[in-house]
Structures are given as structure tokens and as C-alpha cells.
UniProtKB/Swiss-Prot annotation:
Chain segment of the transit peptide: 1-53, 54-79
PANTHER family: PHOTOSYSTEM II REACTION CENTER W PROTEIN, CHLOROPLASTIC
Similarity comment: family membership: Belongs to the psbW family.
Stretches of the chain found on the membrane's Lumenal, thylakoid side: 80-99
Spans within the Stromal topological domain: 121-133
TM regions (residue ranges): 100-120
Bilayer disposition of the protein: Single-pass membrane protein
Gene Ontology CC annotations of this record: chloroplast thylakoid membrane; photosystem II
Keyword annotations: Chloroplast, Membrane, Photosynthesis, Photosystem II, Plastid, Thylakoid, Transit peptide, Transmembrane, Transmembrane helix
Phylogenetic classification of the source organism: Eukaryota, Viridiplantae, Streptophyta, Embryophyta, Tracheophyta
Gene: PSBW
Name of this protein: Photosystem II reaction center W protein, chloroplastic
InterPro entries, per database record: PSII_PsbW_class2
Amino acid sequence: MASFTASASTVSAARPALLLKPTVAISAPVLGLPPMGKKKGGVRCSMETKQGNVSVMGAGVSAAATAALTAVMSNPAMALVDERMSTEGTGLPFGLSNNLLGWILFGVFGLIWTFFFVYTSSLEEDEESGLSL
């Protein structure tokens, strides 16, 4: 893995008597981005099992009630569509977020179909051409 660093060090002097303090060299892993502080942190996951005195009959009834309630109350998920986001899974036809894209697709398909039609009309029709039955 290669790492690129960029650093700059400049000294400015307006007059010989007034020297400005030299700027400190700044090292960043990527040119143009500020350096990120190293934070120590993390995520700790754990799982524990709680065992209780749940009757089998009560669990079956509650599961059936939950399934019935879910079936009755389920609504389709609504996606947040922003211009910066992709249109996958948003319910837009063909994933087209702009009507102009549909016309472009239609025009390209029509242009290719026109070229194919003109090309096939200029072919000779004989027994081995496969264009006639």
C-alpha cells in the first residue's frame, strides 16, 4: 500500500527588518484534505440470552397476533429520493429520474432500429438468406 504525503514550508519577508514567522509544515495524507486526528474509539457488541418462563401456547398466540397485525398494517417502504442519490429501488419506471433520459433512450433505440431496417432492406433475398420464410 502506497501512501502519498504533501507538505509545504514557506518563509515570507516583507522587509528585511520585518520578518514574518515561518509557517509550519503541514503534512496531510491526501493533497487538499485536512489531516484527521487519530481518535481511539470502537464499537463493542455483545449478545446475551434471557431465558424466562414463557409458555408455548402464549408464544404461539403472540406470534400469530404479531403476524396478523403486520399483514394488516404493513405499508410499502417509501424511499427518500434526492437528486444526488441513485434511483434504485425508488419505484421510478426504468430507474429514470429525469423525463429527458426516457426520450434519449427512445431516440437511441429508434436510431439503431432505423439503421437496421435500412441495412436489411438492401440485402439480397435468396434461399439461404434467412430473412424470408
